[in-house]
A protein has these predicted regions:
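Formylglycine-dependent sulfatase
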Residues: 1-190
Length: 190
């Protein structure tokens, strides 16, 4: 987490991030909840140690035969923020909806996120030219993508575009809202 100036990096100046850190909260005790991505993401979003969470490993199927999905009983950071008036979004790698066909209850929209664009499984996220992403609960086809040949639309570029569009849209929504500003939370997971 030391990649930006508020956390000790001295080479690149980040005055806006410095101000954000000074006016907000610096989270310094959470680097990785696990050695692999699924349980680490679940720990980040639920606050549970990976030993107490529903996602404990990265394999598509556990020894019990059940897929590694985030439990519908888990309260996520997005739930808490949404219940406090935030618009919430995740763009990028979700990696906690492994069932085929998709368990809608494990998708981000059922886990407190108003908007989702990205990979639903951790396996797909290991290929940057994957042919199918998800926008909310719907498949988003990239017909020219071939992950075996690394051809088509580079998904991280698409995530960046979607994230920038989301931020601009939230700014426009805030300006149009006469009652006041609606805060937003964007979880951008490359």
């Amino acid at each position: 987490y030391g990649d930006i100036e508020p956390f000790g990096q001295k080479l690149i100046k980040t005055p806006n991030l410095n101000r954000l850190a000074d006016d907000g909260i610096k989270l310094t005790q959470h680097y990785a909840g696990s050695t692999v991505c699924g349980p680490s993401r679940a720990s980040l979003l639920t606050g549970f140690h990976s030993g107490h969470g529903s996602v404990r490993g990265n394999p598509k199927w556990t020894n019990s035969g059940n897929p590694v999905d985030l439990s519908t009983n888990d309260t996520t950071l997005a739930h808490i923020l949404k219940n406090n008036g935030y618009n919430t979004a995740i763009i990028g790698k979700w990696g906690m909806a492994e069932q085929v066909p998709t368990n809608i209850n494990a998708m981000p929209n059922a886990q407190g996120f108003d908007y989702f664009f990205g990979y639903k499984t951790h396996v797909a996220a290991h290929h940057y030219y994957w042919p199918t992403l998800f926008e909310n609960n719907n498949e988003y086809k990239l017909k020219d993508n071939d992950y075996l040949k690394n051809q088509g639309k580079y998904t991280h570029d698409l995530f960046t575009e979607k994230a920038l569009n989301y931020i601009v849209k939230q700014g426009e929504t805030t300006q149009a809202n006469e009652a006041g500003k609606q805060p937003f939370f964007l979880y951008l997971a490359y």
